[in-house]
Amino acid sequence: MKAREANFDGLVGPTHNYSGLSFGNVASEKNQANQSNPKQAAKQGLAKMKALADMGLVQGILAPQERPDVHTLRRLGFMGSDANVIEQAAKQAPKVLAACCSASSMWTANAATVSPSADTADGKVHFTPANLTNKFHRSIEHETTGRILQATFADKNHFAHHSALPAVEHFGDEGAANHTRFCHQYDEHGVEFFVYGRHAFDSRYPAPKKYPARHTFEACEAVVRLHQLTSDKVVIAQQNPDVIDQGVFHNDVIAVGNKNVLFCHEQAFLNQQAVYKELTAKVGGNFKIIEVPTSAITIEDAVTSYLFNSQLIEMPNGETLLILPEECRNNERVWAHVQTIINAKQGIDKVQIFDLKQSMANGGGPACLRLRVVLNEQELQAVNQSTLMNDTLFNRLNTWVDSHYRDTVTDADLADPQLVVESRAALDALTQILDLGSVYAFQR
């Protein structure tokens, strides 16, 4: 049965702010305490989603988390009314409050790992929410993420949902930001490519020294087992620890792949040639590797431009489109090399630029904002149709953003108890628009 790749982008939440919470993410740290614009951020994301839908692609939406997360603050000892909890946290633990206000769930590449039915033993699409243990502000996402995924992909005849891996560093799982699937046609049994930063149970292997390796080898193995994948169609590779120490905190900051194309930097992986050899053997056929040398683009340029944090998409006419953030065009070296790649006709046919400045300032480019889900025709029909982008939904969501979102949010605004009221009102309305049911704690 014919299958297509759908992209489910994260909707930016009403509390989008720059609190510098992500150690190892250069942009996040650099822009700490800057004023954010949640309304603009949400609309930039919606514009990208609508553009892809207008290209004839399947584009879905994943709802944001409930923030401020008063429930987590209560678990941490803050008591009284919601307003009292916010007030106490602002005075006693402002960094904890900031973490509980993060809108980082917009980056749905970290929401989960997804395996299509063509790859799994039971013939279902499998979802495992990422535990994101390395960062507190993200580690509190996975329960709600699981409920949102189950409300979006509800049909048990087609979709299998797992719990997140144990929430300890040994099984640190960053989701699809460290996962790519290669194939020749989407409906064929593909090769799933997992990338990790370190071994948790074996210190003999190299690891980064400056910044944390967020994803473990053991987490990759666990997801392979949960999703019932076969070993001859799986490749597990280690990310180069040296580039993690230069700000490449996920593999999708240094590599992107789709179908039979891998686009990556020459320093992306440990033992890179061996990785290429295994991928080439397992994918078979015409597997294309587009490698960018350091002499053309440094790691620093890759990180600041987010060249590889791009979307590699097959268009309805069969051409391959590379979706890039505007920052790539603003970097002369990067933009020149992009033109070289296009002109060489190595497997990427066209480029499209999007303005995602609000997300980029927190360290999230086009690839961060989307979760890829390969679906056959029956599975696509089984998806919650209210979450699929079209003209009507685009207009409804823009009106919703105008009604509920602030133009600016600063660190000081996070202490405003009214932010809880506004955010819950927004999310309550959103669950009705997207037909999600009661996925949030305040609704349960």
Curated annotation (Swiss-Prot):
One of its GO terms (biological process) is arginine catabolic process to succinate. Its EC number is 3.5.3.23. It catalyses: N(2)-succinyl-L-arginine + 2 H2O + 2 H(+) = N(2)-succinyl-L-ornithine + 2 NH4(+) + CO2. Pathway: Amino-acid degradation; L-arginine degradation via AST pathway; L-glutamate and succinate from L-arginine: step 2/5. Keywords: Arginine metabolism, Hydrolase. Disulfide bonds: none annotated. PANTHER family: N-SUCCINYLARGININE DIHYDROLASE. It is an enzyme of class 3 (hydrolase). It holds the Pfam family AstB. Homodimer. One of its GO terms (molecular function) is N-succinylarginine dihydrolase activity. SUPFAM superfamilies: Pentein (SSF55909). Substrate binds at residues 19-28, 110, 137-138, 214, 252, 362. Catalyzes the hydrolysis of N(2)-succinylarginine into N(2)-succinylornithine, ammonia and CO(2). Belongs to the succinylarginine dihydrolase family. This is N-succinylarginine dihydrolase. The active site is at residues 174, 250, 368. It comes from the Bacteria. NCBIfam families: arg_catab_astB, PRK13281.1.
